[in-house]
Design a protein with these regions (language model features):
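Acidic, surface-exposed loops and disordered segments
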Residues: 1-197
Length: 197
């Protein structure tokens, strides 16, 4: 276990309350609740309002569920298969600017997708759901097996579910089931430039 989380400056409580556990209950996720999470992601800011994100998902019990589980790295399959939904976040490398007809490249798609994921995660938390982002995905297979258009990039996987008891996990994963802490502000925010060594 770690020490309790606390903010050094006043912020909205959901920023420190949200975390990424791996144990889920068997509760199912309705299409309406999932769409509320996508609605939050929809309103994320992006460079030139290009909105380069695309979410492809399956809910547990659907015909596509086993395929979506298999697109995770084996380590993540072991616990994420119990989630209520699995979502893959993909980015598109181009967008059509306002007033234009031809696609233009964007070099900030991954950055914008990260913001959209953050909005989704916070919305899920506000609704009592867990959204756990995962880098351990079969990125190449996601592109081909989910039929993504040319140029798309698989960014992350997201497991969504209700928080379950830690006993649902293996002993190895139980040891990792705690709220992680964060670096202090002075380690990453510098006025006027980087500090001299």
């Amino acid at each position: 276990m770690t020490e309790p989380r606390h903010a050094d400056h006043e912020i909205l409580p959901l920023f420190i309350e949200r975390w990424s556990p791996r144990s889920f209950t068997e509760e199912t996720l309705s299409a309406e609740d999932l769409n509320r999470m996508f609605e939050a992601a929809r309103w994320a800011p992006s460079a030139f309002n290009c909105q380069p994100w695309c979410f492809v998902y399956a809910r547990r019990g659907s015909a596509d569920w086993d395929k979506f589980v298999d697109l995770l790295m084996p380590y993540n399959q072991g616990w994420a298969k119990s989630a209520a939904a699995l979502v893959y976040l993909l980015s598109t490398p181009t967008y059509i600017p306002d007033g234009k007809t031809e696609p233009q490249p964007t070099s900030h798609a991954s950055f914008s997708c990260g913001i959209a994921w953050g909005y989704l995660a916070l919305q899920a938390h506000s609704m009592g759901w867990i959204a756990h982002g995962m880098a351990g995905i079969e990125a190449g297979r996601i592109i081909t097996e989910l039929g993504a258009p040319d140029g798309f990039k698989a960014e992350i996987g997201i497991a969504i579910g209700r928080l379950g008891p830690v006993e649902n996990l293996s002993e190895k994963l139980q040891a990792k089931e705690f709220r992680s802490l964060r670096h202090p502000i002075e380690s990453f925010a510098f006025e006027g430039g980087f500090p001299k060594a």
